[in-house]
Amino acid sequence: MQPLVIAAIVALVVAGIIAIVVWSIVFIEYRKIRRQRKIDKLIDRISERAEDSGNESEGDQEELSALVGMGHDAPWVINDL
């Protein structure tokens, strides 16, 4: 094979690997954002119910503690939202 063809194949492989890494990072961040939105909605719902009824909803608090108590999405991710 010619050197130009080999260089083109290597460039495609490298571009593919970079694309996989970038989209993996995007997917992990998307999951973090989606999880944070769930937590924010639960906190809002708990505070609204506390204002309305004078006490907090036990079911919402349990769901919130389950979401917050989850482990890391990936073991190599240290900072957690």
Curated annotation (Swiss-Prot):
List residues in topological domain: Cytoplasmic: 29-81
Q: What is its main location?
A: host cell
User: Which Pfam families has this protein been placed in?
Assistant: Vpu
Residue ranges, Extracellular side: 1-7
What does the record give under GO molecular function? CD4 receptor binding; monoatomic cation channel activity
Q: Which UniProt keywords apply?
A: AIDS, Apoptosis, Host membrane, Host-virus interaction, Inhibition of host innate immune response by virus, Inhibition of host tetherin by virus, Ion channel, Ion transport, Membrane, Phosphoprotein, Transmembrane, Transmembrane helix, Transport, Viral immunoevasion
**InterPro entries for this protein:** Vpu, Vpu_cyt_dom_sf
Keyword Iron-sulfur recorded:
no
> Which residues does UniProt assign to the signal peptide?
none
Q: Where in the cell is it found?
A: Host membrane
List all membrane-crossing ranges. 8-28
Record GO cellular component, one term:
host cell membrane
Explain the regulation of its activity: Ion channel activity is inhibited by hexamethylene amiloride in vitro.
The Phosphoserine modification is found at: 53, 57
* Modifications the protein undergoes after translation, according to the UniProt entry: Phosphorylated by host CK2. This phosphorylation is necessary for interaction with human BTRC and degradation of CD4.
Task: Give the record's membrane topology.
Answer: Single-pass type I membrane protein
Q: Does the keyword Metal-binding apply?
A: no
Any one Gene Ontology BP term: viral release from host cell
Further facts = HIV-1 lineages are divided in three main groups, M (for Major), O (for Outlier), and N (for New, or Non-M, Non-O). The vast majority of strains found worldwide belong to the group M. Group O seems to be endemic to and largely confined to Cameroon and neighboring countries in West Central Africa, where these viruses represent a small minority of HIV-1 strains. The group N is represented by a limited number of isolates from Cameroonian persons. The group M is further subdivided in 9 clades or subtypes (A to D, F to H, J and K).
As for what it does, the entry says:
Enhances virion budding by targeting host CD4 and Tetherin/BST2 to proteasome degradation. Degradation of CD4 prevents any unwanted premature interactions between viral Env and its host receptor CD4 in the endoplasmic reticulum. Degradation of antiretroviral protein Tetherin/BST2 is important for virion budding, as BST2 tethers new viral particles to the host cell membrane. Mechanistically, Vpu bridges either CD4 or BST2 to BTRC, a substrate recognition subunit of the Skp1/Cullin/F-box protein E3 ubiquitin ligase, induces their ubiquitination and subsequent proteasomal degradation.
Entry similarity comment:
Belongs to the HIV-1 VPU protein family.
Please describe the quaternary structure of this protein. Answer: Homopentamer. Interacts with host CD4 and BRTC; these interactions induce proteasomal degradation of CD4. Interacts with host BST2; this interaction leads to the degradation of host BST2. Interacts with host FBXW11. Interacts with host AP1M1; this interaction plays a role in the mistrafficking and subsequent degradation of host BST2. Interacts with host RANBP2; this interaction allows Vpu to down-regulate host BLM sumoylation.
Q: What information about domains appears in the record's comments?
A: The N-terminus and transmembrane domains are required for self-oligomerization and proper virion budding, whereas the cytoplasmic domain is required for CD4 degradation. The cytoplasmic domain is composed of 2 amphipathic alpha helix that form a U-shape.
Q: What is this protein called?
A: Protein Vpu
Source species: Human immunodeficiency virus type 1 group M subtype B (isolate MN) (HIV-1)
